[in-house]
């Protein structure tokens, strides 16, 4: 099975440090690497996806939400944000705009490096 590279943003890394133990984090990264289209696309974000991930016995429904971007074959998966469902359910409009801006910069960087 094809495995994609997963790049963590500094924000994701800080959030993941608080939400996952080492094994859970490795499991999440491996899952994303194997299933880059696993989550649902968030409208208005330029292709950002949201995936549920169970952590520390919380299960998928009550677990963690992982926000990430996959731009296609040959492009890394960018882990952008992670948060507990108890902290928030969805991204607010300003967060959506912020991730859309970040994704636009990632896409531009990708075009410039080709």
Where are the predicted features?
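Generic secondary-structure microfeatures
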Residues: 16, 24, 32-36, 52-55, ...
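Basic/aromatic recognition patch in beta-strand/loop cores that engages polyanionic ligands
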Residues: 39-83, 87
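Arg/Lys-rich, positively charged N-terminal/basic patches that mediate binding to nucleic acids
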Residues: 1-23
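Charged, alpha-helix-enriched surfaces in structured cytosolic catalytic cores
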Residues: 4-7, 23, 62, 94, ...
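Enriched for short, Lys/Arg-rich terminal
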Residues: 70-114
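Sequence/structural signature of beta-propeller domains
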Residues: 2, 22-29, 34, 47, ...
């Amino acid at each position: 099975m094809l495995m994609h590279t997963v790049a963590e943003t500094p924000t994701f890394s800080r959030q993941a440090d608080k939400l996952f133990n080492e094994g859970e984090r490795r499991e999440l990264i491996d899952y994303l690497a194997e299933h880059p289209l696993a989550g649902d696309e968030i409208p208005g974000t330029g292709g950002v996806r949201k995936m549920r991930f169970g952590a520390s016995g919380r299960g998928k429904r009550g677990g963690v939400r992982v926000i990430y971007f996959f731009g296609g074959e040959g492009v890394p998966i960018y882990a952008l944000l992670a948060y507990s469902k108890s902290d928030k359910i969805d991204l607010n409009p300003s967060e959506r705009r912020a991730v859309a801006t970040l994704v636009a910069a990632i896409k531009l960087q990708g075009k410039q490096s080709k």
